[in-house]
């Protein structure tokens, strides 16, 4: 029961994280995106020239297996913009909605190699590589565009809490 609640909390706090690409066209540069350096999600607009830029929040190193059995880690996504979420394949509530929305993102950016999707399971004891492969096939997930990741439970939860600011309890302690 406790792990189900934790899984739901993690899903509730699934986040979209964007990482800038090194090859930006300055002619089409739009409004810069903010950085989120703390769990309260206060947006900060930091220029590369600012001293704070060297201290921006980043996602910790990770290494998990995707639906094809390939190892996916930070290096696999280096220089990419990626949308990350947390889900589990037997989730009856919000996960199907999130997957449906990410399917639209996959379609929209199908030909853009700089954009990736990464979905971390919060129930790796259920979501094996084979289960993730079946889920990917059922949802038309392109293996080269969207990684469904499984691995060590503690490492996934630690990544969720420390890198993506997902909390054990709803809300933040202030």
Map each language-model feature to its residues:
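Short, acidic, Ser/Thr-enriched surface-loop or helix-capping motifs
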Residues: 66-67
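Thiol/disulfide oxidoreductase modules built on the thioredoxin-like
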Residues: 153-174
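Extracytoplasmic/periplasmic, Sec-exported soluble proteins
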Residues: 54-56, 75, 90, 94-97, ...
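Envelope-exposed proteins and targeting segments
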Residues: 58-60, 82, 116-118, 144, ...
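N-terminal targeting signals for export/organelle localization
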Residues: 1-61
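Short active-site neighborhood of thiol/selenol oxidoreductases, capturing the structured segment around
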Residues: 73-102, 118
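Structural microenvironment flanking redox-active thiols in thiol-disulfide oxidoreductases
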Residues: 99-159
């Amino acid at each position: 029961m406790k792990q189900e609640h934790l899984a739901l909390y993690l899903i509730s706090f699934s986040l979209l994280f964007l990482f800038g690409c090194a090859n930006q066209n300055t002619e089409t540069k739009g409004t810069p995106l903010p950085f989120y350096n703390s769990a309260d999600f206060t947006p900060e607009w930091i220029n590369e020239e600012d001293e704070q830029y060297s201290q921006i929040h980043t996602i910790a190193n990770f290494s998990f297996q995707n639906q094809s059995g390939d190892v996916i880690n930070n290096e696999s996504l280096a220089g990419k913009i990626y949308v990350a979420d947390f889900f589990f394949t037997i989730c009856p509530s919000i996960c199907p909605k999130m997957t449906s929305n990410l399917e639209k993102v996959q379609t929209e950016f199908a030909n853009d190699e700089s954009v990736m999707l990464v979905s971390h399971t919060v129930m790796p004891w259920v979501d094996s590589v084979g289960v993730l492969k079946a889920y990917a096939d059922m949802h038309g997930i392109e293996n080269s565009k969207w990684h469904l990741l499984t691995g060590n439970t503690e490492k996934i939860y630690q990544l969720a809490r420390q890198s993506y600011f997902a909390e054990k309890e709803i809300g933040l302690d202030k």
